[in-house]
C-alpha cells in the first residue's frame, strides 16, 4: 500500500473542523456547498498518511478510503459532552 500525502486545512467558520484533500489547494472534488459552509480554508500542513500512523480523532483507513473515493475528508469536532445529563443519570436511583 502506497503512502499518500494530503493537505490539511482548518475551517475559518467552524471551530475544530478540518478538511483533508489529496494535494495542496486541490478542492476540485469538494462540493461547492461544503466549501461555502467551511469558509476560507486555512492551510495547516502537508502530511503523509501512513498506515501505522495515528491521528487523534481520525481513523487512518477511513481517511485513506475517503480521499481515494471522494477526493476529500471532512473532520468534524466531537459532540459536546452534556455534563448535566451525565450528572442526572449518575444521580438517578438504580434498580
UniProtKB/Swiss-Prot annotation:
Domain of life: Bacteria
InterPro entries noted in UniProt: YcgL-like_sf, YcgL_dom
Boundaries of every YcgL domain copy: 4-88
Cross-referenced PROSITE patterns: YCGL
Protein name (Swiss-Prot/TrEMBL): YcgL domain-containing protein Patl_2802
Organism the protein comes from: Pseudoalteromonas atlantica (strain T6c / ATCC BAA-1087)
Lineage: Bacteria, Pseudomonadati, Pseudomonadota, Gammaproteobacteria, Alteromonadales
Amino acid at each position: 500500500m502506497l503512502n499518500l500525502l494530503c493537505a490539511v486545512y482548518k475551517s475559518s467558520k467552524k471551530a475544530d473542523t478540518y478538511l483533508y484533500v489529496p494535494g495542496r489547494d486541490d478542492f476540485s472534488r469538494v462540493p461547492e456547498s461544503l466549501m461555502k459552509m467551511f469558509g476560507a480554508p486555512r492551510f495547516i500542513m502537508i502530511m503523509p498518511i501512513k498506515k501505522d500512523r495515528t491521528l487523534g480523532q481520525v481513523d487512518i483507513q477511513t481517511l485513506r478510503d475517503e480521499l481515494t473515493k471522494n477526493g476529500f475528508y471532512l473532520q468534524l469536532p466531537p459532540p459536546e459532552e452534556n455534563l448535566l445529563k451525565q450528572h442526572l443519570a449518575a444521580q438517578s436511583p438504580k434498580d
